[in-house]
């Protein structure tokens, strides 16, 4: 009764009663002597009713009551399998029995369906039924594969065989459902495994993997799977994932290398494995014996341990008596750390793989035969079709199938490599036919570019979605593909080598794959050992193969991707450029959107896209990506399992640490206490590596070298004592490695592009266009902010002007002198600072080109235009803008805002703008380095032409050319009489003549070439020429000094011999007394400058340049003077001449003083005007340069044009003009001389 009560509590009584009645009505054993099973009268209907109960009660209500009742009634083993025996293989025409058999499988498939429930979704009913149903399914599998009366699996295939034999075009949906039903039944039988942590009833070998493989082989299920797989895509389409699942549950956790070895080799390997395990056990027991209990352990032991600081510590236990190291470990173990309680970490290990599987010899041979046949005939069609189904996200392809697909691809690729290796061991020489059959073409379906794209997509998506199980499978697949391709490259077949070369180039081409693999290894954290093993194996294989491939292909190119900006109107801009080119316009005139506007309020809506770029691959730089502390921690976590790792896994970790410490020379990354302690324990710790292992020596040497480098580095960098406790970051690593901080470089952001208008328009139209662009781009907030700033500036400027007017009114009654001084001291209006209200506005002021254009149009400018602009640069409104002008600007903005301008061509306001060229931008920046006058002079405002060099230029002629210059000057002086003939000519005619002469001279100057300034011999020196130059200068200076002394003596003056003694000379006194003698001052300064340069340099070339400069300046200053009457002049002109009267208000013209009638005396007297010598230096400042270099050029052109035009006229006597009052050429003139 107690059992009945319990059952009644678990399952509803009415449900149990209905199920029990249906099972009883299904049939039973006969009372005859044979004891065979007899069907009930309505057995087919009963089976259909049972299927409905399972579907509409258990599945709809999410309960398991019906399955629990059927398990307790032993429906499968007691009824359904017995019913299938009534349909023997010889009876192929009985449709009724075939329908009965199909109905039996329709009930068995849901009963054997895998029970997969999420723990969060499970109910109390699920917790009650699941353990019982899992054991019941294990009983179903035992009964099915061990049923002796009839092969149940083969019978299932017989049920679906008529539907399979039909062509795919003639199959009905019912035929498709029957085929899938049978395949699901085979999948369920292969998938059922003993539940973990539950003790099973009966012999587990009857439901083991070996028993399952034997049943599939004996009942010809392998042949069925091979037939379906080889015809996948032709006769079968939606059955691909189900067949893949069946194969997955047959081969998972089976070592492929164990399939393709002989029995003798397998026994030897098992013996070695057993011996290794026994050595590990002995080492473990040896370490335990030091602390294990003895026969006297029942007697308590307590000792006192005196520490270094003098404190006493109590330690209990006999193991404390062994040695000091044991006592210290005992004290450390007594320290308890109570971490905060956290939620239980989810199980990261893959649930569908299970523990490793060991097959018996019979099952191993059967599975080996199936794998070989599958590789030869069914691998390419099946996995090609499955990949296509997964890529197109077919309805029958679930998420779990992705992981199974990549796992199986990796498993079969490894099996193919093991098969080729076994054949190479059997026979070193392979026949041509065998090589053709066993070619890598058998696995070509997973070595295509589409497969690589699917892997990259799955790798990236699983990493982003944190699907660790799928990511583990993809990493396994990647590793096996790399190993397979590497083996292909080592094949003697040239075709395989070429395919391997192309495959490796495609695998290594994408730099995103490189980065993703490095990130996977760097971000490991509690994903389980399977994930850890797959990640470390991928990194090891990837680095090793890539290193070898990069050495063979030094010109390896990879495609890197970077972030870039793309405008929404890029297509429109391209079309505009094309139309402009077709029309013959400049491409610069087309409104192309700017690409440097990174502000959110910029030109167009932008979105980031990936722009690819090929670059040369450098393995050294790439390997650094696998040296950060995260990747090191991943391999350290893997190495901590060193007692459970095989030789291949230990070698993998050893090679990585060796690469980091010695190849990359980043051993500083391994200098951490836990890492050093791990290396020490692996060699000399309480549980070290097996000394008979081939990897022990390598690990011992590696640990020794790393510890040695660590000790040496501690001596060089004492700071490492502290850093031993922490992980190393980039800056810390650089400092510990080199002894100084890593320099940091920063980049300065660039301001927005400068825009200009395509057509010259008025200021109001320009403001209208700029305002319209901001409105079109929905940036009205910038426009409103600018108006607010202008309004505030207008109010402030108006207040300042009112105060200024009030102050001016209070000073009206003051004296004129005081008022003038006050007006002169009155400061200009202060500038107004433009302040952004938000950081976004500040960024827009720096990056938004249209806002910057409008700010410049309204008169705003930067406070420091000579410095490079930054986002923090200050903008101001200069004081030159009045309140009225600011108000007019605001009115223009308001007008453009409410009445935007329209254009004839129907274009937008943005089309009226274009970007300034690079040259224009450079000119704009250069304008800040010169003041306005220098710019105007440089551009030559006086003339329309710019000349880079003066006409003529210095020559290397000797002084014998000077008489020619004398005659020219004489002719110019005598030509002054021609002015009398021009008195009757109008000013317009004179201006026209002068213009023609200027144009003629400009034409001559254009023909001058720059080579007259630069010669190959400019850098050469001539000692003889220098000697002659200094001798000539010495004689010239003596002549001038004598002339000067004689002139001063005639006037009764004396020259002071000591100029620097503190007294002024007579010449200096004359100059100081007459500030208006401009000509004498200019001549003195010119001569002083020329003598200073000649003495300092001593080169003839500089002297000639100074002489040329003097002659040009003389020609500028010698202008025709007007005739004036002089009654008291001490010297009279040779021939009097009448000059036109000087216009009132003009300055006095410089006159020419004749000291002699002959040309030689005239020249010498002119030279005598130069007072400055090598021993006499004046302290006056040099005369300032002309404000515009073009002014001097224009005067020279006018003068030369006038001289050129007067050459044909008759020579006239030189007329002596009225002498300049007070001083001229050193002569002191009394005031009475002017009368």
Curated annotation (Swiss-Prot):
Outline the segment boundaries, as ranges, of region: Disordered: 327-357, 584-610, 812-841, 897-1235
GO cellular component terms given for this protein:
replication fork protection complex
Q: Where is the composition biased (Acidic residues)?
A: 585-603, 929-947, 977-986, 1070-1081, 1099-1118, 1156-1170, 1203-1212
List UniProt keywords, sorted A-Z. Answer: Cell cycle, DNA damage, DNA repair, DNA replication inhibitor, Meiosis, Nucleus
The protein's superkingdom reads Eukaryota
Which residues fall in a compositionally biased region of kind Basic and acidic residues? Answer: 999-1044, 1193-1202
Self-association state and partner proteins as the record states: Component of the fork protection complex (FPC) consisting of tof-1 and csm-3.
What does this chain do?
Answer: Forms a fork protection complex (FPC) with csm-3 and which is required for chromosome segregation during meiosis and DNA damage repair. FPC coordinates leading and lagging strand synthesis and moves with the replication fork. FPC stabilizes replication forks in a configuration that is recognized by replication checkpoint sensors.
Q: What is this protein called?
A: Topoisomerase 1-associated factor 1
Q: Please name the gene that encodes this protein.
A: tof-1
